[in-house]
């Protein structure tokens, strides 16, 4: 039993010197330690020494030492039979010497220990610098893992994504004139999903417009001219956006890692050309040379300023192609969209104009000089590649058809509803896009499975031979 | 063969440009009056610093040369006062009405109307991108091939009603401001006949007169102009 039976520290005491409270020291009945204490006591006159003196004087200890409990009587027997741990003194908290600190218990004395210790020391010394570097890395990771990077891309001051609106013409026909079966639904789902993912990644707005046939206009053929009206409505809906990218439904963005800014708009002068003589499938006479026109209208490239480009289209083998084009918000664009459809022109020409707005635009480009200085063209494969079958069955025209090795941006399966398999094509291009844009882990897995497969095949071939 | 007169105005100086209708690429089957549109474009090319282009048919006389276009018509406040708003653009019963909230300095096209339609032989265009757009749109071959009954006048009335971007820059002003009639043929244009002090007198319809001819009608006014210049007025 501990000496401190009584609760009061004055008599029971003993906590000032931990050596005294342990009943294991000198449990022979002599409770006073007599001389050497394990921990030196700061003050000489302590309770213990006082008790010891009184015990000496008295001749017997001042409390009963007999029969103080089971553990007191049997402690030595119990403690000697308990398992012993090689708990060296130097490891205990109380030990002053601390011989084991800073040493690797298992690796003690080996070379690895020396290296690790040195490394640890270096790290400790450079802890502030390393903390800064670690902080930066964590911020970097945090930027990309959280939606922060998307906010950055979308904001108008940093990434500029909110300045772009993608207009996707969905629900073509709406099932009014023709049945819209599971294939059509699947094509629409794939196309919409592809554009949604792209717009979300780069912070663009996506406007999915319904192109179903509605009896909105007095003349039924006018219904297919909705591109112009839709573009006007969308421009009003997104007043902060600058560029509007029209996409037909049968298109697929093959490389979602290209942003529009980096792919086209950051260097518009290099990515577009204004002189249609560069590639002129319609043989439109250019530049205009009537003497009554001003210099800008007669120049082949307008005023040569990038800011004056308000409309970017591409040409395929047969003329202008409005499956994928860009329109900028400007007064010029407002006027173009206003004058594009006119009943006089429509009445005379709608039977000849198979491609409707496209042909009307070609006619306007040809005949109205105010249009030319503000229209630019981009190479077809920049954002409007064709699959084999459109503009050539073999798909080998390097100006027109999709080239996998060049990683073209977008495929426009134009005219697939006449004679080709739209669903098959979009499926094929989706798989191709997924394969081309695998992340490194998937590439590694595919490499392993491919090499196993080829090893198996070559083994089978050898077996067949022998 | 007729010639029309184009007056360019820049500050206080003005020059006159007489285009020849044969200079412009118009098909043989199209009436020659369409030539006035490329002619205005031509004038804009030849006089790159002129702001206002005042188109005037040859059968018209500027009776009061004291009046300048800037002050008499095109000045912002004056134009806003003169503008006739919220009336059918093409009388008598067009559903399209002129806009009522247009600012004077945004107007690029000033024209008058009589009771039958727009008066297309006397109008003012301000130089600019809109002017190029308007003239090129008006001159689109599809309008010419449509064979409007009154040629470019009907085409003008058509595009002004169908295209809001054109109507947004158009101002109608009272007819006597720049196209007073010498005689009211149809009887409906009361109050639009020429009075002393009017800017321009238009001899529209003088070639259809049975009893007299254009020279006959214009003669007294020529005399008046000559005497005016003699007296140094």
What are the language-model segments listed below?
Chain B
Residues 1-50:
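N-terminal anchoring/stem segment of glycosyltransferases
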Residues 1-7, 49, 68-69, 75-80, ...:
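Juxtamembrane luminal stem/stalk of type II transmembrane Golgi/ER carbohydrate-processing enzymes
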Residues 9, 16, 40, 96-100, ...:
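Short amphipathic alpha-helical segments and helix-helix/interface helices
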